[in-house]
Amino acid sequence: IEKPDYWLTNEEPWGHIDYNRSQKVSFGGEVVEENGKKVWKPAWSVRAVPVDYMVPGYASGRVNTLRLWSAKSYDEFDLLTFNKSEYLDAVKPQVKAENISKILYPEDSTPQGKALRLEQQYFFVSASIHDAIRVFYPGQDKPDLTTFPDKINFQLNDTHPVIGIPELMRVLMDEYGYDWDTAWKI
């Protein structure tokens, strides 16, 4: 029988949580036209909090970092809603966000399960892409990302992470202003 592993509740000595390296991941919404350009207006966002584990290599004298992501809400508790005796509604944003990373590969035989699985896949990919840009272009608001392929490769081991291809294209075009052809070359 599978049981939850509450790996972050007991002050895990090997995991390092770094809220300063959190990434914003947005979902849903709509695309609107502004000044002749299509702009995505997300419906909601979560904070992707990195949890790093050091993984020593066998007989190599090297240590690598395994980065896991934990989804957290930007609005964890709504006091006004709580004070109206709407207790469950007061924590809905927190529950919705944390469900994304609570269980890896949740059951997806229902429409809700399929939606959660897709949100989870997108969450991990988007957080990792934004983090890679932050790591390889530190302190740069508008870096020259044409050198991105020289700095990093993403390994797509399964069908799930291939959502990273359109997400990287979206990031390059929407957030960094590249046109389609340049983004595709990157």
Show where each model-derived region lies.
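A conserved ligand/cofactor-binding region detector
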Residues: 1-186
